[in-house]
Curated annotation (Swiss-Prot):
EC number annotated for this UniProt entry: 2.1.2.9
Pfam families named among the record's database cross-references: Formyl_trans_C, Formyl_trans_N
Sections of the chain in a coiled coil: none
Major enzyme class: transferase
Taxon lineage: Bacteria, Pseudomonadati, Pseudomonadota, Gammaproteobacteria, Alteromonadales
Main function: Attaches a formyl group to the free amino group of methionyl-tRNA(fMet). The formyl group appears to play a dual role in the initiator identity of N-formylmethionyl-tRNA by promoting its recognition by IF2 and preventing the misappropriation of this tRNA by the elongation apparatus.
Xref: PANTHER family: METHIONYL-TRNA FORMYLTRANSFERASE (PTHR11138), METHIONYL-TRNA FORMYLTRANSFERASE, MITOCHONDRIAL (PTHR11138:SF5)
Name of the gene encoding the protein in the UniProt record: fmt
Protein's UniProt name: Methionyl-tRNA formyltransferase
Amino acid sequence: MKPLKIIFAGTPDFAARHLQALIDSEHDVIATYTQPDRPAGRGKKLTASPVKALALEHAIPVFQPASLRNEEAQAELAALNADIMIVVAYGLILPKVVLDTPRLGCINVHGSILPRWRGAAPIQRALWAGDTETGVTIMQMDIGLDTGDMLLKTHLPIEATDTSASLYEKLAEQGPKALVQALIGLSDGSLKAQKQDETLANYAEKLSKEEARLDWNKSAKQLWQDIRAFNPWPVSYFEHQQSVIKVWQADYSAELCSQAPGTIIAATKQGIEIATAEGKLMIKTMQLPNKKPLDVADILNARGDWFTAGVCLNQEAN
């Protein structure tokens, strides 16, 4: 197989792991594109993206245009004369002229089994919706949002213990392997593009802090899915004792209860059991303001008076 001349475009750690796989392959990464350096940390010091840091470590040229819509940036990219451009969590829109520049076009690594969960938050929405599996799709890019022809798909079961954080790690391992496999198929012509079924498509909207507020009028199962989807960001929470209390881990039971939604049924070392519109939510790990996440047993030792049976979390204390 003749090595491909690759432009890699990506920004966060998830992208850097794919770049590392390409560096370790027989292909030639001739340039990287990544977001401009951003202020980070307490000192707001300009910080390079993980992709830039890795590229510099391997002496790969780095380009950081604010946009790829202007002719100068497009000409700069065309002059690289790449065979293919690989895009993983880059963060900039690629206009059609850029998509058409490399000989084999541009391909993208997307964290879902397309056409399900197109858009910004596919990993989180799979958990939020209660999906039983997720995966990675290697896709030929077009001008739509994750609408291009599919080149390769992998599948990953979603476990009851999975959170967005754990799925992110699993897909960050699965994605690079799938990408290298897809490049082999593209090079030897064995990979056949498959169109997406538009009737199965849906959109993975970005998460918001407001959406992370626990609504006890939902079912216990849905709240359990929310808590897993919103870990590690924005983290599910409820308000009680004039405090925002984050919930990191929970379980649920479909067993019906007579108490009003939001009522504490029991508070023990095993967890805080709360009535919902359908079933019971059992909170296992919480975080009080300005504190670290702790097991419920430790929180009850310090704030047991906040979480007694019969207290309704829908009613804030004065």
